[in-house]
């Protein structure tokens, strides 16, 4: 494959999202859309990834180079802004709001575009509204014209072959051809599609890959597709999901073979789940949760930045945050790892085979040694040594005849009287 630069068009204002976050930074399955694009293109080792951004944006942490489009004058003008950074023989141009685009789509574009000055990805859509229509030259697989939705005639709107917004160009060709692009359209903008007559048409295998995001509803739709793809891949690797439709796993999560994931589970980015785990139902494994082999994380358990050793059981109603938990530990229901002092987060360490009693509160920084115990209901603020039991609660006192002092006595008397009357009825 020839050297290729990638230009990501990311300068659009994204006003239809109706929020203050830059559109390319909206997340799909835990990753910004811009990162999805970068992950796809990096797989074929481009020479440079260049983002064209607005004056108020900074995408430098995602790409190799950035350039600013000072005015929104159209896609051709955006690409022109990137010309000083282009050094390779060919370039791929792609919009920043296409998180479902795959490496295979881009490789197919490069391979089938060989020998052409330009090529573009297309899809055959049953409902093409909103997309530019691709008009081919007769039966040939090359472009005669691309017409944007707002500029199309009634007959052109009936066409189903649409422009995906992903292009391959010979650099020398597009640097010449872009000078012939005019603003003779309804938007008075420089359309990059006007430089595509004669371009090779390359159709994607899965039309979902070309879906773009302009609204919150579209963001939700592509997120649903992305999560299904993630779940399908995880299940293909030997993981059981009781209900994939209610299992939400981010893109950069690893799950080991033989693990069972129950409904309502959420597993967030940078987490690694070991083999033979049982997760859920209704478990929330937040970022940087790492589990060993044969770990059980049950219903209504939340973890974050936690390393959990082999054979450990965290059954229910527990928060484990900023923690290192050893092997074969039992953490009872209602346990809270108290990790935040109002300013800083602190670590809790629990050694192998420790037993944490129900409703314990471990106030970090604190360490529970191997084979140590905390008594149920304790608030542990000091380290507990090996083989010791930490108890931090007041001894129980029973006060006799206390019921009669409470208002419950009158209520109970009235309740009993009413039920006695019902029992007397035939």
From Swiss-Prot:
Provide the active-site residues from the annotation.
316 (proton acceptor)
Chief subcellular location:
cytoplasm
- Which reaction equations make up its catalytic activity? alpha-D-glucosamine 1-phosphate + acetyl-CoA = N-acetyl-alpha-D-glucosamine 1-phosphate + CoA + H(+); N-acetyl-alpha-D-glucosamine 1-phosphate + UTP + H(+) = UDP-N-acetyl-alpha-D-glucosamine + diphosphate
Identify the EC number(s). Answer: 2.7.7.23, 2.3.1.157
Q: Where is this region: Pyrophosphorylase?
A: 1-216
Q: Where is this region: N-acetyltransferase?
A: 238-426
Which keywords, in A-to-Z order, does the entry hold?
Answer: Acyltransferase, Cell shape, Cell wall biogenesis/degradation, Cytoplasm, Magnesium, Metal-binding, Multifunctional enzyme, Nucleotidyltransferase, Peptidoglycan synthesis, Repeat, Transferase
Q: Which residues bind Mg(2+)?
A: 97, 214
A Gene Ontology term for the protein's cellular component = membrane
| Localization per record | Cytoplasm
In terms of superkingdom, the source organism counts as Bacteria
Instruction: Give the CDD domains listed for this entry.
Output: GT2_GlmU_N_bac (cd02540)
Where UDP-N-acetyl-alpha-D-glucosamine is bound, by residue? 9-12, 23, 69, 132, 148, 163, 214, 286, 304, 319, 330
Cofactor binding note of this UniProt entry: Binds 1 Mg(2+) ion per subunit.
Q: Does the keyword Transmembrane helix apply?
A: no
Q: Does the keyword Cytoplasm apply?
A: yes
**A single GO BP annotation from the record?**
cell morphogenesis
Linker as annotated region, ranges: 217-237
Swiss-Prot/TrEMBL cofactor(s): Mg(2+)
Q: What does this protein do?
A: Catalyzes the last two sequential reactions in the de novo biosynthetic pathway for UDP-N-acetylglucosamine (UDP-GlcNAc). The C-terminal domain catalyzes the transfer of acetyl group from acetyl coenzyme A to glucosamine-1-phosphate (GlcN-1-P) to produce N-acetylglucosamine-1-phosphate (GlcNAc-1-P), which is converted into UDP-GlcNAc by the transfer of uridine 5-monophosphate (from uridine 5-triphosphate), a reaction catalyzed by the N-terminal domain.
Q: Subunit structure, briefly?
A: Homotrimer.
UniProt xrefs under PANTHER family:
BIFUNCTIONAL PROTEIN GLMU, NUCLEOTIDYL TRANSFERASE
Family that this chain belongs to:
In the N-terminal section; belongs to the N-acetylglucosamine-1-phosphate uridyltransferase family.
- Put simply, this protein is called Bifunctional protein GlmU
**Which organism is this protein's natural source?**
Oenococcus oeni (strain ATCC BAA-331 / PSU-1)
Protein's gene: glmU
């Amino acid at each position: 494959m020839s050297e290729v630069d990638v230009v990501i068009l990311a300068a659009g204002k994204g006003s239809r999202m109706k929020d203050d976050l830059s559109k390319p930074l909206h997340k799909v399955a835990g990753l910004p859309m811009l990162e999805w694009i970068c992950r796809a293109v990096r797989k074929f080792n481009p020479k440079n990834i260049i983002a064209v951004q607005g004056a108020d944006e900074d995408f430098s942490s995602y790409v190799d180079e950035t350039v600013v489009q000072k005015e929104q004058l159209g896609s051709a003008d955006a690409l022109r802004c990137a010309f000083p950074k282009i050094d390779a023989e060919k370039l791929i141009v792609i919009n920043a709001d296409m998180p479902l685009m795959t490496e295979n789509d881009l490789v197919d574009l490069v391979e089938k575009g060989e020998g052409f000055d330009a090529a573009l990805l297309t899809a055959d859509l049953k409902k093409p509204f909103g997309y530019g229509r691709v008009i081919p030259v007769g039966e040939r697989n090359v472009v005669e014209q691309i017409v944007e939705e707002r500029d199309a005639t009634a007959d052109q709107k009936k066409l189903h072959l649409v422009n995906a917004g992903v292009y391959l160009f010979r650099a020398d060709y597009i640097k010449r051809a872009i000078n012939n692009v005019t603003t003779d359209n309804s938007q008075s903008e420089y359309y990059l599609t006007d430089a595509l007559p004669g371009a090779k048409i390359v159709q994607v295998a899965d039309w979902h890959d070309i879906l773009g995001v302009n609204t919150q509803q579209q963001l939700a739709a592509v997120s649903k597709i992305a999560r299904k793809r993630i779940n399908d891949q995880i299940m293909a690797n030997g993981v059981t999901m009781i209900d994939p439709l209610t299992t939400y796993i981010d893109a950069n999560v690893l799950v080991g073979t033989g693990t069972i994931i129950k409904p309502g589970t959420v597993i967030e980015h940078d987490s690694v789940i070991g083999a033979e785990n049982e997760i859920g139902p209704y478990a929330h494994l937040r970022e940087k949760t790492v589990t060993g082999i044969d770990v059980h994380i049950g219903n209504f358990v939340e973890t974050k930045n936690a390393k959990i050793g082999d054979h450990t059981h965290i059954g229910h109603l527990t928060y484990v945050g900023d923690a290192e938990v050893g092997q074969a530990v039992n953490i009872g229901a209602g346990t809270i790892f108290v990790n935040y002092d109002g300013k800083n987060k602190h670590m809790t360490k629990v050694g192998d085979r420790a037993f944490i009693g129900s409703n314990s509160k471990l106030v970090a920084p604190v360490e529970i040694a191997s084979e140590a115990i905390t008594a149920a209901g304790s608030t542990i603020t000091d380290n507990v040594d090996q083989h010791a039991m930490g108890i931090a609660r007041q001894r129980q006192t029973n006060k006799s005849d206390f019921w009669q002092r409470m208002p419950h006595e009158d209520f109970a008397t009235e309740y009993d009287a009413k039920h006695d009357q019902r029992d007397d009825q035939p």
